[in-house]
Amino acid sequence: PSSSNLPKQFNLLYVKTINEEIIILLKDIDSDSYPRLHILKYSQSLEDELKKASLDLKNGVKTIGEIDTSISNNHYGITFRKIKKNIPVK
């Protein structure tokens, strides 16, 4: 697991809750580095946010994770927003 801070923007790849921890695998959007595992302390609001994002991921909805403590209801400031698909004009 990474000991670095969460990136400002990221793609969520995987989520697993084990006991009092939530393990997430994510890819930093602003970096060419490999995806990293982060272990977060459990909270109900964080789990709810990550479950919604995981469901979107399974349903093929493109989302971006962001850190914004001003609008988030969890300790880490994690929020997700949906990205519209850009379809080229024919």
Mark where each language-model region is.
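Hydrophobic residues embedded in beta-strands of well-ordered beta-sheets
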Residues: E20-I22, D32
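Charged, low-complexity intrinsically disordered regulatory/assembly segments
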Residues: T17-E20, K62
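Extracytosolic and intramembrane catalytic regions of membrane-associated proteins
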Residues: K27-K90
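Soluble periplasmic/extracytoplasmic beta-strand elements of cell-envelope proteins
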Residues: Y14, I23-K27
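Alpha-helical transmembrane signal-anchor/signal-peptide segments
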Residues: P1-I18
